[in-house]
A protein has these predicted regions:
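Structural signature of PLP-dependent enzymes
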Residues: 1-7, 85
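Conserved C-terminal alpha-helix-loop-beta "cap" of PLP-dependent enzymes
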Residues: 13, 20-161
Length: 162
């Protein structure tokens, strides 16, 4: 399975515009190792957000990736996957690039936004709550996790100022 994963990375990187990282990132300092069965594929260089590629793979090619975010998709290889499945993924990614790629300058630039922590998560979660429409929450303190799924990464957490 390791050989199949490395083959997938090589073929995906040959398409151009995608980057499926491999062992070149291991530096012994901040990155020690990674799960080779997970294909993390950067998509922004073809002008598409990861979630867009995720949706296209699912809707147009019947390929279910694990998740997509602003700049990447994550796909797993399992013991049930063979060369044929990898070839389907690589072909789909190549066709997505050909059919749907656009100027990457149109993508939203995302910078990390430091949250304003107004109180501890415990205080916010267990404190008194009020349910409001999202448009009326500016300046309030979040009391629950707010996230999109997939991938399930919090946008707001308890205690953060909205």
């Amino acid at each position: 399975m390791v050989e199949l994963a490395e083959y997938a990375r090589t073929e995906i990187n040959r398409i151009g515009g995608y980057y499926a990282y491999s062992k070149e990132l291991i530096n012994g300092d901040s990155i020690y190792d990674f799960d080779v069965t997970k294909l993390s594929i950067h998509t922004r260089d073809i002008g598409l957000a990861g979630i867009e590629v995720y949706d296209l793979l699912r809707d147009e090619y019947d390929i279910q990736a694990e998740f997509g975010d602003l700049g990447n998709i994550l796909a797993y290889l399992s013991i049930g996957d063979r060369q044929r499945e990898v070839e389907r993924l690589v072909s789909a990614l190549a066709e997505i690039k050909r059919r749907f790629s656009r100027d990457k300058s149109t993508l939203m630039d995302f910078d990390y936004i430091d949250p304003i922590v107004a109180m501890s998560p415990q205080e916010a979660f267990y404190g008194e709550k009020e349910s409001l429409p999202i448009r009326e929450t500016a300046g309030r303190v979040c009391s629950e996790f707010v996230m999109c799924y997939p991938p399930g990464i919090p946008i707001l957490t308890p205690g953060e100022q909205i």
